[in-house]
Amino acid sequence: RDRSPSRGLGDVYKRQAMLNFWIAGIYYLLYGEQREHNDMLALFWAIMGCIWVYDLVVKHASLQRTHNHTGFALLLFAMPLVYPLFSLALGRTFPMVTTPVMPCSVAVFTIGLMLAFSERINIVLAMFLCHWALIGLSKVYFFGIPEDYLLACSIVPALYIFFREYIRSNEGRPTKPSPRVLNALLVVLCIIIGASFAFTMLHQLNLFTDV
């Protein structure tokens, strides 16, 4: 079956790449000079932009609509709008309000996009997004941005879905450990990550009251 992206999906690839490059070049390099390690953060998003370009060029159709996980995906699609509402509820005003085009908002939207069109997930991009969620969790503590719990909470079920689909796609191949063991290990890993997120959230409850 032809897995090359349709014209519509090709436009999605281009917009996602441009958005990632915008975050890298404008958000971090141009306006984020005062932030520590802004160049590394810019490189992180530039690499993700390159992944979208790579998928487009080699016609790796990592976005093919399957109608799986639609409810969860729609929830994540709404998160970029929830972010500023969350900021307003915390009493923030512009420019402290988290906007829909900030890194964590874009990361949540991208996770939703990959869930809604998850016939063939780019596992490298999924790993980058999972890593960004961990970075976002640290920002809750160091920068007092509890909005980033939205990304941290969404990544645990998404992580399980991404890697479960990846394991299933290789189910017919001889692997060590077996797919059943890999799936069990994945469940344990997600439980551990989810428990650590929950512990961090409970530990930082005083941060919510102080903001």
Predicted regions and their residues:
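Helix-loop junctions on the outward
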Residues: 11, 22-41
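Single conserved hydrophobic/aromatic residue that forms the stacking wall/gate
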Residues: 2-13
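Internal/C-terminal transmembrane anchor helices
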Residues: 177-202
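Central hydrophobic cores of alpha-helical transmembrane segments
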Residues: 14-21, 123-135
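Membrane-helix boundary connector in multi-pass membrane proteins
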Residues: 30-34, 116-125, 134-147, 167-176
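Membrane-proximal helix-loop-helix units in multi-pass membrane proteins
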Residues: 34-111
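Juxtamembrane "helix-exit" motif on the non-cytosolic side of transmembrane helices
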Residues: 25-33, 83-93, 136-146, 199-207
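Loop-to-transmembrane alpha-helix initiation sites
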Residues: 37-41, 142-157
